[in-house]
Each structure stands twice: as structure tokens, then as C-alpha cells.
């Protein structure tokens, strides 16, 4: 299996396949990852999501893809956290 695959989550299109295949599916908060280039079924529902082998891979993918995109009117202009470091932090 590849370490990372992208998909769009409208009605379970990331989370369900991940669950069926024993992978990690992650749907970030709407606007966290740019949706430029995505053909939406509904702007309010479609999210870019990732399918990965592990939570660590998902955190790394989010760290790389997250951030404000001025070309996406729904993109959130908020700082990107260090998601990989957050995994190592005590609970």
C-alpha cells in the first residue's frame, strides 16, 4: 500500500474505505486543506482528506498540506500547528 492517498470526503468517501481496508482515514476541518482543483458535489460538504498507513503518516500529510490558500475562498487563514510534534506530547 502507498504511504498516502488523497480523496474527497462528501459522504464517507475517505473514512469508509479506510475503515474497510484497515487504514487511517482523516478528514480535517473544512478549510484546513485547500480544495482548489476539487470538483465539489456541495461546497459545504466536500473536504480533501487523506488515507494513510498510520496516524503518524496522517499527521505528516496534514503538516505538509495545511495552510491558507488565497485561491480557495473557504481556506482558513489560521496558523499551522506542528502536528507531528503533537503526537509525541504527553496526553
Language-model regions, residue ranges each:
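Active-site-proximal alpha-helical scaffold in enzymes
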Residues: 1-19, 51-55, 62
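Short, hinge-like loop/turn segments at secondary-structure boundaries
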Residues: 21-25
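A short helix-breaking turn/cap at a secondary-structure junction
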Residues: 27-91
Amino acid at each position: 500500500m502507498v504511504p498516502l492517498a488523497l480523496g474527497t470526503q462528501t459522504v464517507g468517501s475517505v473514512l469508509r474505505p479506510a475503515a474497510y481496508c484497515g487504514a487511517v482515514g482523516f478528514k480535517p476541518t473544512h478549510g484546513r486543506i485547500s480544495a482548489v482543483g476539487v470538483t465539489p458535489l456541495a461546497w459545504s460538504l466536500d473536504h480533501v482528506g487523506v488515507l494513510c498507513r498510520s496516524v503518524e503518516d496522517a499527521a505528516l500529510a496534514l503538516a505538509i498540506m495545511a495552510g491558507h490558500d488565497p485561491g480557495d475562498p473557504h481556506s482558513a487563514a489560521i496558523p499551522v500547528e506542528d502536528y507531528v510534534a503533537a503526537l509525541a506530547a504527553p496526553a
